[in-house]
Amino acid sequence: MILSDRDIKTYINSKKLVINPLSEDTIRENGVDLKIGNEIVRIKENMEKEVGDEFIIYPNEHVLLTTKEYIKLSNDIIAFCNLRSTFARKGLLIPPTIVDAGFEGQLTIELVGSSIPVKLKSGERFLHLIFARTLTPVEKPYNGKYQKQKGVTLAKED
């Protein structure tokens, strides 16, 4: 079942869903918009974090971004990450991304550049999370290697 804005507010008030910081205006009809954090990593041979208020995503470039918000999902909620249409209309892409029940942390999202340079600003709403409730709480909530991550987190070996 997809959560409505009312459901999302109920989950937030009961602490079953935590989004910090949370702006009331980011709670949408059927999801929550998340903002770009202030870190980026360009995926190339020498991957270094860049910290700033603005970033240019160059044509066909692959980057990792982080969300400004730290989230925590209870063991009966998952989230689907979608790029807001404003950015998709500029030609940017993200791969299908699911946030598992029990996840806690800032999200690291891969973004693929357009055919033209695109400027991103820290604090811009760029992701739309759609929350869904599982029929029953999961037996084994997420407790993987990216649990409680902060900032852009590079791939970790298994």
Swiss-Prot record:
Name the pathway it acts in: Pyrimidine metabolism; dUMP biosynthesis; dUMP from dCTP (dUTP route): step 1/2
Gene Ontology BP term (one) = dUTP biosynthetic process
Q: What's the EC number here? A: 3.6.1.23
Q: Which cofactor does it need?
A: Mg(2+)
Reaction it catalyzes: dUTP + H2O = dUMP + diphosphate + H(+)
Q: What does this protein do?
A: This enzyme is involved in nucleotide metabolism: it produces dUMP, the immediate precursor of thymidine nucleotides and it decreases the intracellular concentration of dUTP so that uracil cannot be incorporated into DNA. It does probably not deaminate dCTP.
Name listed for the protein in its UniProt record = Probable deoxyuridine 5'-triphosphate nucleotidohydrolase
Source organism (scientific name): Sulfolobus islandicus rod-shaped virus 1
